[in-house]
Structure formats: structure tokens, C-alpha cells
């Protein structure tokens, strides 16, 4: 029995080994066959296509500008332009539109809808403000008033007129002593304007205000200097820069053609070469023909790059002057006559608030609030 059992176990082992070997060989053959199979004709899986979204108009003008300072300004509200406007950061706003609607008076652009609804002067944006953008875009909101509201406000805009400046508290000597504002007084005056809620209109805005097309805040003021004397550059402009106040330098372009010393200084014309007296002691503005005046002012505008407003030398002007100014394409002329700009003021005879030596902060407040 034992001998027979051993034989059976031996045969069984041989059979099992044979089966295992067959399985191994067969499995290996199967693996070999799968690895070396002929690939089937399969349909490749579709890949997700890249979808290109078109740029918005605001994104497009920024892309076209190719400048990291570029900023697309979009406008919201009744009468707002549909197209965005290109501006540049590190500069002041330029040429913001003044829309028109029948029977309405535009009341400005604001940084928020709430600001527009409240006519918040602190939120109002114009060419006195630096361009500030987020992701190279900014949105401005329109506000409107009725003509009756605008007229009832009875806004009067002072145009401040400075000439030369002195660092001497006791002033300068000589017959032009009154022209030299003490720079300490000037600093206090500019600080007052900067910190008490004044609005600084552009000349475009002043023109629209005179027409009754634009409402200006009650506390509006325009800062100007005549002659572009070196003391303006050395003493006054640093103060203008410190307080970030829009100002105008009326330049005699035959005498000097300096570039604007600050983004807050607009160069405008004090004529090219008419700041000289004729034989009768009066300025060329009232001695020359309209054609001669227009030719001089055209030269000045070409040098300055703008022919918008002129300050009359010595304040002299007449109807011939006005004709020459209009022929040259200027909109406005500034006199030395005292007064305030109101709706309907003669654009070619703008009055001023003259600031002389000895007029401190109290004198300014008594004149402009």
C-alpha cells in the first residue's frame, strides 16, 4: 500500500507540474501576443479647443496703446459716451467729455454712482485730477441738474491773478512792488484752497459753465499767473506741486517757451510778442489790426500746442482785439478787470480777482470764501 501510494503521489506531482508549466507558457504567450497585437482602428478622443474671448472695447484700447500707464475710462449714466476713452496714469485727465441733453445741465463726472447722486464735490473728477486706475480701467458716473437748479445756485467763479513772487516778507522795492506776492502768503492761500473743499475747473469747463451747459460747485476757483516770471518757476510752482492744485501759466512765448514745470501747470497764451506798448502807451492788443493780432496769437498757439484762452497784456482790449482773438481760434480772453465769472459772462472779457503783495490769507478768504 505504501509503495502504491508513493507512485500515485509521484504521478500526481508530475501532472500538476505539467499543468503549471502549460499555464505559464500559455500565459507568457498570451502576454506576448497582447503586447505585439495589431492596434485596432480606434477613433481618437476629441481634445478641448481653446476658446478665445474677444476683448471688450476698454481692454482693446489698452492693448492697442501698448503702454503700462494706459487707462481705459468708461462712462456710465444718462448721456454718457458709449465708447471708452484712453487716458494715462501719472498725468491729469485730459479732455473729459461734457455731454449735452435737451433741457438738462451736466453736473460732472464722479468716481462712484453714490457720489454722482449726491453731487459730492470730493468725488467729482475732472482735468485737475491725476488718472488713477485699477487693472488699467476706471469707471466714471454722470450727474445732471435742471436749468432751473443751475440758475438758482448763482455760482460765481473767481479767476485768481498772480504775477511775480518774493521770498522777502517785507516785499520788493520799486514801482512793481505790488506785483510780488510773498511766497509765505501764497503757501497759506494754496493750503486753504487745497484743504477746504474747493473745485478747480478746467478752461473747457469754464466755457461750458458760461454757456449754461455745465454746473460748477459753489466753491470753484481758477488759479493763474501772468508773465511766467522766473519767480513763478522757482518759488510758486513748488507750492502748486505740494498741494497738487491745477493752475495756469500765461506765457509770453517770444520771451520764453519753457515746458510745463509740473503736471499741475497748464501753459496758456499771454500773446507771442504783443506784451509791448505802442506809441500811445497802450499795448499792441489795441493798436494792431485784427489780422495782426490773429497772426501773433496763432504763433503763440503753435508754440504752446493750444489756443484756448489768452490773457490780455496790460489788460488792454477792444472790439478789434476780440475779433483777432476769435480769428485765431481762441475761445476766451482774460482781462484785469475785477469781478467773477457767471453764467452768460462775455467769454472774451473774463474778469479776475487780483492778488497783490500784502494780501494774506484773510484777504483771499474775503474774496473767494
Q: What is the predicted function of each stretch?
A:
Residues 337-366:
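A cross-kingdom marker for long, charged
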Residues 1-13:
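Terminal targeting segments of Actinobacterial cell-envelope proteins
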Residues 17, 22-34:
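Hydrophobic alpha-helical membrane-insertion segments, chiefly the h-region
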Residues 155-181, 216-221, 229-231, 235-237, ...:
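Metal-dependent polysaccharide deacetylase catalytic core of the NodB/CE4 family, i.e.
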Residues 66-68, 100-101, 132-136, 145-146, ...:
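Extracellular/periplasmic catalytic domains that process cell-envelope and extracellular macromolecules
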Residues 41-107, 111-146:
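Secondary-structure capping and domain/repeat boundary segments
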Residues 29-45:
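Sec-dependent signal peptide cleavage junction
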Residues 110, 114-219, 358-369:
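N-terminal pre-catalytic segment of deacetylase/amide-hydrolase enzymes
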Amino acid at each position: 500500500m505504501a509503495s502504491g501510494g508513493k507512485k500515485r503521489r509521484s504521478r500526481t506531482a508530475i501532472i500538476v507540474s505539467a499543468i503549471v508549466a502549460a499555464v505559464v507558457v500559455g500565459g507568457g504567450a498570451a502576454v506576448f501576443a497582447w503586447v505585439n497585437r495589431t492596434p485596432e482602428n480606434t477613433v481618437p478622443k476629441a481634445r478641448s479647443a481653446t476658446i478665445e474671448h474677444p476683448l471688450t472695447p476698454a481692454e482693446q484700447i489698452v492693448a492697442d496703446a501698448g503702454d503700462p500707464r494706459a487707462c481705459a475710462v468708461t462712462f456710465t449714466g444718462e448721456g454718457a459716451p458709449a465708447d471708452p476713452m484712453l487716458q494715462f496714469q501719472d498725468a491729469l485727465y485730459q479732455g473729459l467729455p461734457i455731454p449735452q441733453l435737451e433741457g438738462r445741465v451736466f453736473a460732472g463726472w464722479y468716481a462712484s454712482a453714490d457720489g454722482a447722486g449726491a453731487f459730492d464735490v470730493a468725488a467729482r473728477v475732472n482735468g485737475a485730477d491725476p488718472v488713477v486706475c485699477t487693472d488699467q480701467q476706471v469707471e466714471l458716473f454722470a450727474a445732471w441738474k435742471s436749468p432751473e437748479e443751475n440758475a438758482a445756485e448763482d455760482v460765481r467763479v473767481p479767476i485768481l491773478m498772480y504775477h511775480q513772487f518774493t521770498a522777502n516778507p517785507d516785499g520788493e522795492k520799486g514801482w512793481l512792488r505790488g506785483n510780488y506776492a510773498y511766497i509765505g502768503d501764497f503757501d497759506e492761500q494754496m493750503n486753504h484752497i487745497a484743504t477746504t473743499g474747493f473745485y478747480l475747473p478746467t478752461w473747457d469747463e469754464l466755457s461750458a459753465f458760461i454757456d449754461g451747459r455745465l454746473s460748477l460747485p459753489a466753491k470753484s476757483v481758477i488759479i493763474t499767473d501772468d508773465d511766467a516770471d522766473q519767480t513763478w518757476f522757482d518759488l510758486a510752482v513748488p507750492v502748486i506741486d505740494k498741494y497738487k492744485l491745477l493752475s495756469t501759466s500765461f506765457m509770453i512765448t517770444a520771451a520764453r517757451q519753457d515746458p510745463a514745470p509740473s503736471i499741475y501747470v497748464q501753459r496758456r497764451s499771454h500773446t507771442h510778442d504783443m506784451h509791448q506798448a505802442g506809441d500811445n502807451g497802450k499795448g499792441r492788443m489795441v493798436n494792431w489790426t485784427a489780422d495782426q493780432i490773429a497772426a501773433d496769437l496763432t504763433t503763440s498757439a503753435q508754440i504752446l500746442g493750444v489756443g484756448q484762452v489768452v490773457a490780455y497784456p496790460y489788460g488792454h482790449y477792444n472790439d478789434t482785439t476780440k475779433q483777432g482773438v476769435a480769428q485765431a481760434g481762441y475761445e476766451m480772453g482774460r482781462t484785469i478787470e475785477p469781478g467773477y465769472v457767471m453764467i452768460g459772462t462775455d467769454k472774451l472779457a473774463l474778469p479776475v480777482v487780483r492778488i497783490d503783495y500784502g494780501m494774506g490769507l484773510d484777504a483771499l478768504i474775503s474774496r473767494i470764501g
